[in-house]
Amino acid sequence: VRTADFDYQLPPELIASEPLPQRSASRMMVVHRDSGLIEHRHFSDFPSYLRPQDLVVLNDTRVVPARFFPDEGGREVLRLEAISPLRWRCMIKPGKKFRLHQQFHLGGATGTVSEVLENGERLIDFDQPVDEATYGHLALPHYMGRDDQPSDTERYQTVFAREEGSIAAPTAGLHFTPEVLDQLPHAFVTLHVGVGTFQPVKVENVTDHVMHSERYEVPQETASAVNAAGRVIAVGTTATRTLESVAQSNAGRVVAARGSTDIFIYPGYQFQVVGALLTNFHLPKSTLMMLVSALAGRDLILKAYAEAIAQRYRFYSYGDCMLIV
């Protein structure tokens, strides 16, 4: 399987850099796997595609401010993980200003580079907790071409976000309002989205790609609901990867579990749990493009993307969505 097989050309003006005024006003392309039919609908039509005994599974992770700008200026800290309130694992730039034992300040807190990891990440120890509400920013995807605004605090967060820990939003969930959610039989899993979600696959052969690892949790009530459901509709690639990862370790069944997963789903993968998927439009050559191709077939996905471009759909995190049935 070649990475180049998942490429497409997107006119830059179709990248949605701002959300629509209303969450649920997005367009929704419906892709039928069996017939190859492609329909153009709106997200408000989503409930009409549910059958009796269907279960909608969503990711209830909450995006945390992960981008910090030290008082010294000209530097940026991207927190990948808060190991404790006083110890962070970070990516930083420029690296030369963050050598071992170097210090910097975030408000009243002093950070010290305590370890430089092999991959260039840093462990930083603080003398007191950082005031995240004041100094933290949302790490919006680079393709939005802008810094975060106050409105993103609400809109780059799902209405059902509960468990803090993501750097990026599980974007398929952004379309839901409480009113839509109330109409649907649903359950939650948690997967904390890491920075790896945006990284393109840089190797020529897909199987050589090393997948990033992300923390997840499946509660008992969700496991029971999934196993009793007729068809599971995953909202987003993150919910998909969580369910499939747990099923892979448990002979096809979903059980209550927590841990880390680096599951990489690409064409040839046999889905054990997920029967339908609501997802946004993804970056070329990304692992997410490969995941949707595993479910619907690469040719049908590329055809659907070409049609989305022709019909001027809005792409990526703040963009429109696709329902694969």
Model-derived regions, located:
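Surface-exposed, charge/polar-rich loops and edge strands
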Residues: 1-325
